[in-house]
Amino acid sequence: MRRLASLAVALPLLAVVASPALAQDMSPRQSAEAFGVPAVSSSWVNQDGSTMTLVFGAGNSVSGFYVNNAPGFGCQGTPYPLVGLTWGNFIGFTVAWDNATANCNSVTSWTGFAEAAGSDVTIVTDWNLAYQGSSSGEIQQGSDTFTLVNKAMKETPKM
């Protein structure tokens, strides 16, 4: 598997991964701590300048907003709802590209893991974008690395 060796990260992350039963029953605070962030909103940016706000919720749930700024893609510059799940330092989240501003008739899902290196925390992901092609549904694939920008936002973006 890609980057399997990188799973050996900070001790708090290893403790959660080593015990799936613990990860399954984690509180929002414990889930957030596995990602190296407090149990409030956190802001992330990827290599293309897209941003997301993650809010760790009940159980293993995560929600928030995603703002696409990737060159060559539509639905840019406005927040779209994000929903997902965490398992220890692993994460999966999805954005349906439809809000009051624009509907791109597509859905993107990311899966990945958080890792810490010194004071930096990143989420390394692969994504699948499902959209309507010229004659049928198509899937485009890629990868993103998100870097933690700030550990505690006082408010989330307005929809």
From Swiss-Prot:
Pfam family, one: Avidin
Signal sequence range: 1-23
Classification via InterPro entries: Avidin-like_sf, Avidin/str
Disulfide-linked positions: 75-104
Compartments (UniProt record): Secreted
Entry binding sites for biotin: 46, 50, 66, 68, 74, 106, 108, 144
GO function terms (MF aspect): biotin binding
Residue stretches making up the Avidin-like domain: 36-151
Keywords: Biotin, Disulfide bond, Secreted, Signal
Family of this protein: Belongs to the avidin/streptavidin family.
Domain-related comment: The C-terminal segment plays a key role in the formation and stabilization of the octameric configuration, since the short afifavidin (lacking the last 5 amino acids) is only dimeric. The X-ray structure of intact afifavidin shows that the C-terminal segments stretch into the biotin-binding sites of adjacent non-canonical monomers.
Subunit note: Exhibits a dynamic oligomeric assembly: the apo form self-assembles mostly into toroid-shaped homooctamers, with a small fraction of homodimers, yet upon biotin binding the intact afifavidin consists solely of the dimer.
Free-text function comment from the UniProt entry: The exact role played by afifavidin is still obscure. Forms a strong non-covalent complex with biotin and 2-iminobiotin.
Name of the protein in question: Afifavidin
